């Protein structure tokens, strides 16, 4: 994000949008933004909410270190995205995959917001991800990874 110098008012009027709002962004998040742009003309009075749909409420990237069965310490990258919490707490699982990206987790959290709203359940949208091949971990390692990831994202999950 680029900001100019000066008063708060001039900063607010001259900043560049965060890169995650760029519909030309490659990957799942960019695809989601393009889909939102494509349906906007059909939203009528609801179109005023489009910018909200394009902005995740919170993005958390965490380092998740765990002790492996052989005694070494391995580090995994984890993500938690809370897309929208206006309908209630964020609902969404965790994707364990070696190729998961922040872009993918952002898109999945946004779709959770839309799915929950479409079926009128009192939840917002959220999603998590951990870059790991779970097939390469023992059950004990997978349990330690899950517990540590949950601990690391604890600052944004749970009762308010």
Model-found features: residue ranges?
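N-terminal ligand-binding/catalytic initiation module
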Residues: 2-160
């Amino acid at each position: 994000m680029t900001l100019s110098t000066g008063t708060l008012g001039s900063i607010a009027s001259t900043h560049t949008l965060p890169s995650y709002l760029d519909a030309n962004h490659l990957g799942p998040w960019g695809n989601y933004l393009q889909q939102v742009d494509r349906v906007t003309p059909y939203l009528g009075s609801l179109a005023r909410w489009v910018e909200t749909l394009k902005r995740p409420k919170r993005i958390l990237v965490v380092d998740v270190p765990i002790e492996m069965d052989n005694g070494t310490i391995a580090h995994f990258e984890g993500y938690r995205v809370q897309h929208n919490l206006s309908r209630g707490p964020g609902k969404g699982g965790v994707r364990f995959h070696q190729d998961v990206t922040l872009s993918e987790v952002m898109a999945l959290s946004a779709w959770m917001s839309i799915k929950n709203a479409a079926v009128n359940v009192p939840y917002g949208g959220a999603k998590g991800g951990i870059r790991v091949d779970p097939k390469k971990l023992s059950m004990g390692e997978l349990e330690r990874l899950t517990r540590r990831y949950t601990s690391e994202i604890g600052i944004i999950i749970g009762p308010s």
